[in-house]
Regions:
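C-terminal flanking tails of non-heme Fe-dependent oxygenases
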Residues: 1-167
Length: 167
């Protein structure tokens, strides 16, 4: 079982790095900017392999169903990508609800920065937005942020950004 899992992990890493390359390009950042910012860490969140509904995202004060698509992968960006992109990509609250009478199987995978990585808005993106937005995202060490996150996981992200900014 070890060999298939290692192969699976390797392919997930390749996928995550490809997604980061596309994000770099879309944001007009230098090649491998996000990967380098992650400092060797392993923040996308991907859900694989289910044909059963139940995944929801929170938008504009309500929960919206994410419709399952055959052979599709759902990728949620994390708070660290929101900060690196200076808010151009948003992290999303999500949840999975049980559906009576249906079996839902999915595999969640995370590609997070190293706990020692410093996360901050990309300087190229700070220049593209107004001063009010510039100050919305703090610079932080990812491990410090995860400590705050562990205590405030199900609360809005803005207080977490504020708490880590004060560290």
């Amino acid at each position: 079982m070890t060999e298939p899992m290692e192969e699976y992990r390797s392919e997930l890493k390749k996928l995550a790095e490809k997604v980061m390359e596309v994000m770099d390009e879309n944001l007009g950042l230098p090649k491998e900017y996000i990967k380098k910012a992650f400092n060797g860490g392993y923040g996308e969140n991907a859900f694989f392999g289910t044909k059963v509904r139940g995944l929801q995202i929170h938008k504009d004060g309500e929960w919206i169903d994410v419709q399952p698509l055959p052979n599709a992968i759902v990728i949620n960006t994390g708070d660290q990508i929101e900060v690196l992109s200076n808010g151009l990509y948003k992290s999303v609250w999500h949840r999975v609800l049980p559906i009576p009478g249906e079996n839902r199987r999915s595999i969640a995978s995370f590609y997070n920065p190293s706990l020692k990585a410093t996360i901050a808005p990309a300087p190229e993106l700070v220049e593209k937005v107004d001063q009010e937005v510039d100050q919305a995202y703090p610079k932080f060490v990812f491990g410090d942020y995860m400590s705050v996150y562990a205590e405030q996981k199900f609360l809005p992200k803005e207080p977490r950004f504020h708490a880590v900014k004060a560290m």
